[in-house]
Amino acid sequence: MADNSIDGLRARYGDRWRWLAVCTVMLGTMATVLSATVVNVALHGIMLEFGIRQGQVHWLATGFIAAMTTTMLASSWLLDHFGVRKTLAGAMVLFTLISIVGGFAGTPGQLIAARIGQGAMAGLMQPMGMYLVFRIFPRERRGQAMGIYGMGVILAPALGPVLGGFLVDQLSWRYVMFAPAPVTMLGVFMAWRFLPLPPSRPEPYRFDLPGLLLLGATIGLALDTLNRMQELAGAEWRIGLQALVAAILLGLFVVRERSARHPLVNIALLRNPAFVYANLGAMALGLALFGSTYLVPLFVQTSLGFSATEAGLLMLPAGIVLGITFPLAGRLADRQSARKLVVFGIAMFAASAMLFAVSDVTLAFGWLALWTILGRIGIGFMLPALSTGALNPLKPEQLGAASSTINFTRQLGGAFGVNIVALTVEFGEHSDGLPTINAFHSAWWLVAVFVAVAAVPVWRMRA
């Protein structure tokens, strides 16, 4: 039998094996990021085909992010028990099948269910890049490996909207669901060849399934409560009851995590004020990143008459600039005050959102692209500095749990951010069943205010 341990694979393929393994995991991450971004340019077409409004279509983005946020906390247990090869290959197989089924969806409910399934598998795959790099590379080569891995991760959101726009305009929105499948199919083949099996069966420990179920129910119910606010007239009691149940479930989750031997979220970390402030900043970052990625394509297609391809091309320069900004901001975060860099990023993004909030239908493509770039520069400065500010004050043994927590918080901010901006657009002014430019202006102002207010706790990080 072939030796599929780390040493066995290195002996079989030589030093290039490490890079083949990194490329394998990168394929999984690229597929999930592609899936998260490519659908946004298809939302307008989906609304028209199914005759639905913001109150339903936003679940294609919100459901994906919420499911990803919840299941990413389960990846550590799966990696410990099954190893990176079986976990990644299994998640990619399921992701592929769900994507294909979603492409044939006949109702909005079926499509939303497929997006939730995609998000659940994406949550399992997303943390594996850093895990693998730290397992197979020596300390002095990890930075280089993360840089190569990061290039692929950044490439996907830059190209995703362009690919999605082309598929929608030339074929159908259904091909947006099919798009990640070839990538994950190749990833399954490579995973079975290049990813290691664990050298021995690890000592088993109980997975915190009650915690995961409580967390998933809390997030889902809270998001649905927000969504139902558009039906406020005559439904106040139902909305209030749902909000109360969500609050009770959240309380039960906190109690569970405080008593569990292997909790999903280490509640004790929240005793560190700097970590709490950084997590508030991370929630604002999630709202900024996912909220703007949702809003920009829908805004320019619905209010400005852009095609799906034009909407994707509008996002492309911003994705490239984000890829350039990210490593630069990372180097600055090692030398400069983290809070100053984050506040600078907040200011840049808030300025971008305010410029969108005062735009009109005569605005040229170039100006819209420039404002999108401005927002991505802000996000590029926020992301690495927030991680530095959150993790630097902690003890070495807390870093793993803290890293997982801040990633979770950022995704949670994204899930609620998309829901809130979609609700704002839905409540706004409409004409012929579609939101007017004024409805989108309200959403952009809301995003700008939310992100700007986050500067207050971020400044108190003292990092």
Stretches found by the model and what they are:
Residues 72-210, 362, 396:
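Helix-loop-helix hairpins in multi-pass membrane proteins, especially solute transporters
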Residues 9-12, 140, 188-216, 234, ...:
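Flexible interhelical linker loops that connect adjacent transmembrane helices
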Residues 151, 155-171, 220, 224, ...:
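A gly/Pro-rich, aromatic-decorated transmembrane alpha-helix motif that marks the paired
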Residues 181-200, 216-228, 245-259, 454-462:
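C-terminal membrane-cytosol helix-exit motif in multi-pass small-molecule transporters
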Residues 224-233, 445:
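Juxtamembrane C-cap of transmembrane helices in multi-pass membrane transport proteins
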Residues 18-34, 39-43, 50-64, 69, ...:
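12-transmembrane solute porter fold
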Residues 100-101, 166, 220, 224, ...:
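Alpha-helical transmembrane segments of multipass membrane proteins
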Residues 1-14:
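Short, Lys/Arg-rich, polar N-terminal cytosolic tail immediately upstream
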